């Protein structure tokens, strides 16, 4: 019986890894598109600027959840979360650059 539970657990963990890879890939594709349009604009104001943009995204999430509506161009909660994912990565990139 314990073997059955171990297999179930391992299957769940493998699926989580696949899910994470999908989220990472989706975020990367969006980053590529936006980077083509905007370049390194996110770096202009440094980490603080990225954190401000993250705050804007969090506020948008709160409004979407509270009012069950979208705010800009039918932006959904998932889209905003992917943006947050990318902003976090951008902040890490800037921090890494500062450490060099």
What feature does the model see in each segment?
Residues 3-100:
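Intrinsically disordered, low-complexity regulatory regions
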């Amino acid at each position: 019986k314990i073997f059955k539970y171990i297999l179930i657990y391992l299957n769940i963990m493998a699926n989580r890894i696949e899910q994470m890879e999908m989220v990472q890939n989706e975020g990367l594709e969006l980053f590529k598109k936006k980077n083509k349009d905007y370049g390194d604009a996110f770096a202009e104001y440094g980490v603080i600027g990225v954190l401000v943009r993250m705050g804007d995204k969090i506020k948008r999430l709160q409004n979407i959840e509270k009012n069950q509506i979208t705010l800009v161009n039918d932006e959904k909660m998932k889209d905003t979360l992917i943006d947050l994912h990318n902003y976090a990565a951008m902040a890490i990139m800037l921090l890494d650059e500062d450490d060099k």
